[in-house]
């Protein structure tokens, strides 16, 4: 109970900073146990902490792939719900891949991670439908952990 009770306070420490994140917004994050390893990702409403999507675990992934997929899924979710929100992510690599509209992973394709590569191909195709998007870096130093963080560090 104590862990649960203290989480919302810790997650929302950014409310009291001089330059808090923009609201409303969507925060995305990924978790990967090892590299490669089991990968999952999710998106949450930054303000409320409500989880709006979650996927995985998928075997044989990397954190950057998860972040890339989470951003694209977030863009799709915002478009489907006709919302013009900022997306916060904490992976510079994934954001660069989004801007290039290409997941530039060096991960070798294997039988165990074939599903991930199917998701990557679908995400890259989906990116062709987005003319503009607002993705910003989550400022962990100023705001604490991203609200979508899985808390496994």
Role assignments for model-derived ranges:
Residues 3-6, 47-48, 96:
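A broad, low-specificity signal for short, low-complexity segments enriched in glycine/proline
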Residues 52, 70-72, 113-114:
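Short, charged/polar low-complexity linear motifs in solvent-exposed/disordered segments
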Residues 13-65, 76-77:
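RNase H-like nuclease fold core
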Residues 1-18:
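Short glycine- and acidic-rich boundary segments immediately preceding or forming the N-terminal edge
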Residues 32-35, 75-151:
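RNase H catalytic domain
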Residues 7-10, 23-26, 115-120:
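Short amphipathic alpha-helical surface micro-motifs
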Residues 63-68, 116:
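Short, charged, low-complexity patches
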């Amino acid at each position: 109970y104590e862990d649960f009770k203290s989480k919302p306070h810790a997650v929302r420490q950014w409310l009291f900073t001089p330059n808090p994140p923009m609201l409303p917004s969507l925060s995305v994050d990924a978790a990967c146990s090892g590299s490669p390893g089991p990968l999952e990702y999710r998106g949450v409403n930054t303000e409320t902490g409500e989880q709006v999507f979650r996927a995985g675990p998928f075997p044989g992934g990397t954190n950057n792939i998860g972040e890339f997929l989470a951003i694209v899924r977030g863009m799709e979710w915002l478009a489907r719900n006709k919302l013009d929100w900022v997306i916060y992510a904490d992976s510079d690599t994934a954001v660069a891949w989004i801007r290039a509209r290409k997941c530039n992973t060096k991960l070798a394709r294997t039988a165990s991670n074939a599903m991930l590569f199917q998701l990557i191909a679908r995400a890259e195709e989906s990116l062709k439908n987005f003319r503009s998007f607002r993705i910003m870096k989550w400022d962990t130093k100023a705001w604490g952990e991203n609200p979508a963080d899985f808390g496994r560090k």
